[in-house]
């Protein structure tokens, strides 16, 4: 599969650099994208506009803007569902997706509402570019996470102060606030949420218990 990268040359204040050059999870965003897509894409093309994308070979193609942050769990879900569908798809999200409404939509324009879904700047084409492209709704898997306790009398109107952490992260970076969101909420905390979710499965608990027996260590000290 080839990937087509649409350049976003807007500079993010106060860094005065485009989003692709800013560091996310200790590496430039463009390198994070490349590492995430390496298992799926064999070639790449960079263009300034969607209309510049060559469409002569009719090959499997992934198109995205270079200011997007996404993780392995998200891209795996999107590509597997799009491939099983076998039709041109565009990343979309439900209107009631808490991760999108709470953390991804403010201060940006790349994820916007069209009809009864939010659509983003990532497309999948199984046989080259097509005019007809249907939205493919991806559930980010909101995982409620409270970082600290707020007194009841201060949060009785809107409930407890919590973050909605995605199990499948996607973000359009257009503001310095999004760098914090990508690194902390959608990065480190998202990885922790996936680990916590996996530990709740009985099979994983048994694996850890068995490993601790083999190593003759406490459960929290074993190598698993």
Regions found by a protein language model. Name each.
Residues 1-55, 75-76, 80:
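N-terminal glycine-rich phosphate-binding loop and ensuing alpha1 helix
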Residues 58, 70-165:
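Conserved core of the sugar-phosphate nucleotidyltransferase
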Residues 45, 101-111, 208-215:
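Noncatalytic linker/hinge segments flanking ATPase motor cores
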Residues 50-52, 66, 97-99:
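Extended charged low-complexity segments that act as oligomerization/scaffolding linkers
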């Amino acid at each position: 599969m080839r990937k087509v990268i649409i350049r976003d040359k807007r500079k993010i204040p106060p860094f005065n650099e485009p989003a692709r050059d800013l560091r996310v999870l200790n590496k430039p965003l463009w390198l994070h994208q490349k590492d995430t897509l390496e298992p799926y894409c064999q070639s790449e093309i960079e263009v300034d506009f969607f209309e510049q994308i060559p469409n002569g070979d009719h090959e499997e193609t992934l198109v995205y803007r270079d200011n997007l942050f996404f993780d392995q769990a998200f891209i795996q879900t999107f590509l597997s569902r799009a491939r099983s569908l076998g039709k041109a798809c565009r990343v979309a999200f439900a209107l009631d997706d808490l991760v999108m409404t709470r953390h991804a939509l403010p201060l940006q324009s790349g994820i916007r509402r069209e009809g009864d879904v939010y659509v983003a700047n990532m497309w999948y084409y199984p046989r080259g570019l097509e005019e007809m492209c249907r939205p493919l709704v991806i559930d980010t898997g909101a995982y409620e996470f409270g970082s600290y306790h707020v007194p009841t009398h201060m949060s009785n109107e809107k409930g407890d102060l919590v973050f909605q952490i995605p199990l499948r992260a996607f973000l359009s970076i257009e503001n310095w606030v999004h760098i914090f969101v990508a690194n902390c909420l959608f990065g480190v905390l998202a990885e922790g949420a996936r680990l916590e979710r996996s530990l709740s499965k009985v099979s994983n608990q048994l694996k850890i218990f068995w490993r601790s027996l083999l190593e003759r260590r406490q459960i929290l000290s074993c190598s698993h």
